[in-house]
């Protein structure tokens, strides 16, 4: 095994969603240290790697959301150390804002060097809001998407597929295609963290078979395969 990168993550920022498959197992309580302390630690780690292991990639992340009280200043630090968050932000779970507040935030982010934001959709409106455990979240993401288009900030949109929402994927994609997207893709949520909650509704081969061609076209079949196919091809680690 070869080490190629080192990541430091601090779960110190609350998220306004409670999604059923949260990788970080967000349960309403932050577990990280205070942000200034974590930034100082990340800086020391980065400086050490630059002097001793410059061939290793390094990234610093904070979560559970990007609702950082000093987000713009933190972006400066992320860009300074070459962390992806200096140019790209996952925009799920942000607090509700009025349109003019969204516009101001996005313009400030652009001015700070952010080039791309990412939004995740869990189905059409009613199902999405239930899945994210926040009424109004679907409409809020569409407002963010619309205003991002207006200020010329690139947006990626991910469609999280499971057994319950597979039948909504075509309608959802049609709705999203009314906007300008840098990339739109469908994926199967992971099983880590609170993703264990999705096991009863895990996406199945029959769900894939029923998808419209438009959705199949944005689904990475090489990455997301039935378990039986992975076993037959022996594309898994030996423990």
Where are the model-predicted features located?
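N-terminal pre-core extensions flanking Radical SAM catalytic domains
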Residues: 1-31, 232-238
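Core AdoMet radical
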Residues: 6, 26-39, 52-68, 81-100, ...
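SEC14/CRAL-TRIO lipid-binding/transfer domains and related phosphoinositide-recognition modules
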Residues: 10-14, 37-44, 69
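Radical SAM enzyme [4Fe-4S]-AdoMet core and its adjacent flexible, acidic
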Residues: 25, 31-33, 39, 122, ...
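Generic structural signal for well-ordered alpha-helices
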Residues: 42-46, 72-76, 102-107, 142-145, ...
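Acidic (Asp/Glu)-rich catalytic clusters
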Residues: 48-53, 75-82, 104-114, 146-150, ...
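Polar helix-capping/helix-linker motif
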Residues: 98-99, 108, 221
